[in-house]
Amino acid sequence: MNFRTTFAALLVAAGSLSLAQGCSSEDARSKPRSSGTSGMVFTADERGNSISVINLRTSMVETTPISVSPHNLQTSSDGRSLFAVGSPAEEGGDMTNAMDGPGRLLGFDAAAVSRGSVFDMAVGRKPAHVIVDRQGARAFVTNGGDNAISVIDLARRQTVKSIAVGKSPHGLRMSPDGNTIYVANTGDGTVSVINVRDLVEVVRIPVGKAPVQVAFTPNGRYSYVSLRDENSVAVVDTASRRMITKIPVGPGPIQLFALPSGREIYVANQGTEAMPGNTVSVIDTTSRKVIASIVTGAGAHGVVVSSGGDRVLISNTFANTVSVIDPVSRKVVENVPVGLGPGGITSRATKD
């Protein structure tokens, strides 16, 4: 097992190990430090076949090997469960997630990831992203190799439906009202809109070259779609279900996320492995223009906002770090080492 040491020397004395997840003395973790920010952040370490857990209050990191090369992960709305998707570990790790065989969906207790998964089930080919409905009853997984979305009953741990969408679906998000899911179809330049009640695709919206992920404004009026091969972000009016404009950003935009205020969208510009991007574009949602560019680590990929809304977290795929951004100053306040090849990123609140 390979674990990563972060921020300080490995803490040897067992009495000094204070991570609340009940991990063993073999785990490498950072020296605790106090912070005004709380919550937990999880990264899908695709090259390391692991999940890293960051305690935002202490900056302690725990990295746990798992049985897949996870591309993406997501917590449930109550923060109790964590779900990860990817290819079997012996097949993945090349950052493409391009295996032909079935992928896997793993479920974890979000407070005890180091104990291993509580379930492991097959999904479709080339799984990319996973989301969970508000009730925690169903999970939705994009299967890029099947051009479909798996709908999973989490109580029965069974796939109950496969929804046909566009070519090579990748990222997906549920609208704030929970009624629709927007799916970025990387292979055909469209976004599929799924009716959550009926579990059917109701429309397919043309947006541009290689859409990777979507983000909603908190009021649900607009969806922002990263267009990797155009170095831009498309803006979709969710009422008319039409694209209304495009906003130039940095090279190879991947994930994006709105601040709780809805005033700004943070876009991670990954670039390519040969020419990595290392910036985050900040879009003003009123002017629909980039108002700041923040330097992060190489291969800025995933974006999430902390549960308290006071930090923006960026996974840096080629730097093996997470950049912690203060959205007020728009500056990186910390770079946290995690596992190898962090891609997907998610967060949850804690009671501490």
Please state what every model-predicted region is.
Residues M1-A9:
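Bacterial N-terminal signal peptides that target proteins for export
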